[in-house]
Curated annotation (Swiss-Prot):
Protein name: Cytochrome b
Cofactor(s) in the UniProt record: heme b
Lineage, highest ranks first: Eukaryota, Metazoa, Chordata, Craniata, Vertebrata
Residues binding a ubiquinone: 201
CC cofactor note: Binds 2 heme b groups non-covalently.
Alphabetically ordered keywords of this record: Electron transport, Heme, Iron, Membrane, Metal-binding, Mitochondrion, Mitochondrion inner membrane, Respiratory chain, Transmembrane, Transmembrane helix, Transport, Ubiquinone
GO biological process annotation, one example: mitochondrial electron transport, ubiquinol to cytochrome c
Residues noted as binding heme b b562 in the record, renumbered to the chain: 83, 182
Gene that encodes it: MT-CYB
Predominant subcellular localization, coarse grouping: mitochondrion
Residues that span the membrane, as ranges: 33-53, 77-98, 113-133, 178-198, 226-246, 288-308, 320-340, 347-367
Oligomeric and partner information: The cytochrome bc1 complex contains 11 subunits: 3 respiratory subunits (MT-CYB, CYC1 and UQCRFS1), 2 core proteins (UQCRC1 and UQCRC2) and 6 low-molecular weight proteins (UQCRH/QCR6, UQCRB/QCR7, UQCRQ/QCR8, UQCR10/QCR9, UQCR11/QCR10 and a cleavage product of UQCRFS1). This cytochrome bc1 complex then forms a dimer.
Length: 379
């Protein structure tokens, strides 16, 4: 009799994805982040579900309901801070996952890569709408500033913004619909994750060398299940340290002030994980130009398969490309720092130079360096 896990239609799916899946024997810890992202998504959905049971999406009571969760609900404080800091862990894993894909040429699997970009946009949209829900000062003004960017779209911009707001300013209708979408999107993300995995399992995983590994595969279980469990343990430990010792480290103190449309905070800034894009947005004096640069800063990832000029897939044996990659990482860290600074000298010019360098590296320098490497290797 065949083993039930190989014959039962449901168990067979799980078996082929998590147990008998052939995996390259040499994938490093950089390949752990896919499973870590899955765990992050699960943590966010579970904590979010319990928070939604106590939250009210009304401008009059939203702020109070969050306070009520933290003070009166059993373990409500840990739910709230797990959810808020879980988002930060989610983005740390996301950025490392995308960085791994760039470094090792995983974007050559175009379908998997493009679904991944869709996932990135969906997670960013979810995080933005979630940040609005506590209805603090930064929630309100962040929502006002970011939704207002759509008014830069020619002809339909103003109508579009008012349609999204459900009125002439960010108000009750906006908060209610943001809550509805914030609840809905994680389930859409879950569906996209399944599609992402479906495409990945069509081709199999890439590996650090970028060389096909069909002749040297090992079963996913027990080798990579135990490896993923170690990664999960480290991540959960880091998350718990953050939640239990300094839960407000990554938040903005202004969000402990209830939303007030008559009082603008001195520095409006998003959560840390959006600062790099916010810095690019602010670097361009023109509104429409800034919005386009903001969208393109993420959408440019879709061009990566077209910009791959090297004859090798991975950067493992390409020292010049490695220099460009780490320059890009340093540039993104600079942009993140600039995004949190006030708009004044010297931060303006640093932000503009970092923004130019970001696009220059991806569109010009990295493809050029790859061509140079091909010639150096006489290929």
């Amino acid at each position: 009799m065949t083993n039930i896990r190989k014959s039962h239609p449901l168990f067979k799916l799980i078996n082929d994805a998590l147990i008998d899946l052939p995996a390259p024997s040499n994938i490093s810890s950089w390949w752990n982040f896919g499973s870590l992202l899955g765990i992050c998504l699960l943590i966010q959905i579970l904590t979010g579900l319990f928070l939604a049971m106590h939250y009210t999406s009304d401008t009059a009571t939203a702020f109070q309901s969050v306070t009520h969760i933290c003070r009166d609900v059993n373990y409500g404080w840990i739910l709230r801070y797990l959810h808020a800091n879980g988002a930060s862990m989610f983005f740390i894993c996301l950025f490392l996952h995308v960085g791994r894909g760039l470094y090792y040429g995983s974007y050559i699997y175009t379908e998997t890569w493009n679904v991944g970009i869709l996932l990135l946009f969906a997670v960013m949209a979810t995080a933005f709408m979630g940040y609005v829900l506590p209805w603090g000062q930064m929630s309100f003004w962040g929502a006002t500033v970011i939704t207002n960017l759509l008014s830069a779209i020619p002809y339909i911009g103003t109508n579009l913004v008012e349609w999204i707001w459900g009125g002439f300013s960010v108000d009750k209708a906006t908060l209610t619909r943001f809550f509805a979408f914030h609840f809905l999107l994680p389930f859409i993300i879950s569906a996209l994750v399944v599609v992402h995995l479906l495409f990945l399992h069509e081709t199999g995983s890439n590996n650090p060398t970028g060389i096909p590994s069909d002749m040297d595969m090992i079963p996913f279980h027990p080798y990579y299940t135990i490896k993923d469990m170690l990664g999960a343990l480290i991540m959960i430990l880091a998350l718990l340290l953050l939640v239990l010792f300094s839960p407000d480290l990554l938040g903005d103190p202004d969000n402990y002030i209830p939303a007030n449309p008559l009082n603008t905070p001195p520095h409006i800034k998003p959560e840390w994980y959006f600062l790099f894009a916010y810095a690019i947005l602010r670097s361009i004096p023109n509104k429409l130009g800034g919005v386009l640069a903001l969208v393109l800063s993420i959408l440019i990832l879709a061009l990566m398969p077209l910009l791959h000029t090297s004859k090798q897939r991975s950067m493992m044996f390409r020292p010049l490309s490695q220099c460009m990659f780490w320059l890009l990482v340093a540039d993104l860290l600079t942009l993140t720092w600039i995004g949190g600074q006030p708009v004044e000298h010297p931060f303006i010019i640093i932000g503009q130079l970092a923004s130019i360098l970001y696009f220059l590296l991806i569109l010009v320098l990295m493809p050029l360096v790859s061509i140079v490497e091909n010639h150096l290797l006489k290929w």
